[in-house]
Amino acid sequence: MKKLPEDFIFGGATAAYQAEGATQTDGKGRVAWDTYLEENYWYTAEPASDFYNKYPIDLELSEKFGVNGIRISIAWSRIFPKGYGEVNPKGVEYYHNLFKECHRRHVEPFVTLHHFDTPETLHSDGDFLNRKTIEYFVEYAKFCFEEFEEVNYWTTFNEIGPIGDGQYLVGKFPPGIKYDFAKVFQSHHNMMVAHAKAVKLFKDNGYSGEVGVVHALPTKYPYDPTNPEDVRAAELEDIIHNKFILDATYLGKYSRETMEGVQHILSVNGGKLDIPEEDYKVLEAAKDLNDFLGINYYMSDWMRGYDGESEITHNATGDKGGSKYQLKGVGQREFDVDVPRTDWDWMIYPKGLYDQIMRVVKDYPNYHKIYITENGLGYKDQFDEERKTVDDDARIDYVKKHLEVISDAIRDGANVKGYFIWSLMDVFSWSNGYEKRYGLFYVDFETQERYPKKSAYWYKELAESKEIK
């Protein structure tokens, strides 16, 4: 039987826009998602899980079920409704109250400054493609670092990679642009500059606590490891989703291999990446200052060589087999592999998490420590009305197998200090609405009642014994 360390964090993850609701309440400014959902979907993030009002219940459940850490994000537009300028005191008060309740319940808050929710005013002006947004973000970060002294763990961004991908490659995030690789890389780079500036400011000003970043790191494999085209496709996919942002985080520059891949993709698809020389100094100054890396991991992908046009079909319905992903000059994802997958065509491959952790350890030895900041199974949960619970054995099995490879990585020298299941309770899903559930606690979105799932009881026993069984 495998065990986890005594000081290991057994956490649950949330995000402001996916959990809080109250999207227009108490002075909160609009974000691009408000309009985008209203215009394109049959659902909105109102009231989501009503965490804005229900957080005392969720934190009480956390304490009761052994969850000793919680990922929370601050809604930038709840603090600065326009992203800059006048502060909203009710937003500040809300987060003080929330963090106070976390500590009262002995649940350590790991607080993210940006989780997919740039204020609408800045988003409509180019988001992070506009370099002014970098400076506005740093000012917002400085305000939070100074205001919320009760926070011990800060994360600048959640998933810089999927933000650029969602906005400019897949087109499922506002502004809904597809296949614009130049914007993808420019967004990634500019956000990494914003991260580096915020981290340097945190350390220069001597704030207490720790600061890091959360990256989504889906592992990429060649479908046929003996086929050079498949190997190259996996390398290029890895550069887009992982290596570009990891290089910026820990090398303070982009390796020759990374830039060759970027230039190849841009030469095939058009566009250019603009990196002022000053940016390299900013990245270099911060590369050793990250106290931790958060890794979000759900799946791996298998890549084939491909010489056609870009075409992505996003499976938002949970009808298995509805996905297509092929990129001009990069490769195509092969879904017909002997690996289980979710209804949303996400490949379930725990070894991919082990390989990704050990890749960070090997290639970026200045990583310091790792938290697995998101991992979990999206499922069409069947609520048992009589017993008021969900028998989510598939979720337990998924989490168990990923925790086992985390234990293996620790054994093999990786400094992994905690795990945050996505998600603490059921929350709103960006491109799936309310059907796709991840939580330990089932949320009846009509009544906002919470009900522990079978996985919550399993997680409680795990947190108490540290034994994976």
Curated annotation (Swiss-Prot):
InterPro entries: 6P-beta-galactosidase, Glyco_hydro_1, Glyco_hydro_1_AS, Glyco_hydro_1_N_CS, Glycoside_hydrolase_SF. It holds the Pfam family Glyco_hydro_1. The active site is at E159 (proton donor), E374 (nucleophile). GO terms for cellular component: cytosol. The keyword Hydrolase applies. Keywords: Glycosidase, Hydrolase. One of its GO terms (biological process) is lactose catabolic process via tagatose-6-phosphate. It catalyses: a 6-phospho-beta-D-galactoside + H2O = D-galactose 6-phosphate + an alcohol. The keyword Chloroplast does not apply. Gene3D superfamilies: Glycosidases. GO terms for molecular function: 6-phospho-beta-galactosidase activity; beta-glucosidase activity. It comes from the Bacteria. Its EC number is 3.2.1.85. D-galactose 6-phosphate binds at Q18, H115, N158, E159, N296, S429, W430, K436, Y438. Pathway: Carbohydrate metabolism; lactose degradation; D-galactose 6-phosphate and beta-D-glucose from lactose 6-phosphate: step 1/1. NCBIfam families: lacG (TIGR01233), PRK13511.1 (NF010036). Belongs to the glycosyl hydrolase 1 family. PANTHER family: GLYCOSYL HYDROLASE, LP05116P. This is 6-phospho-beta-galactosidase.
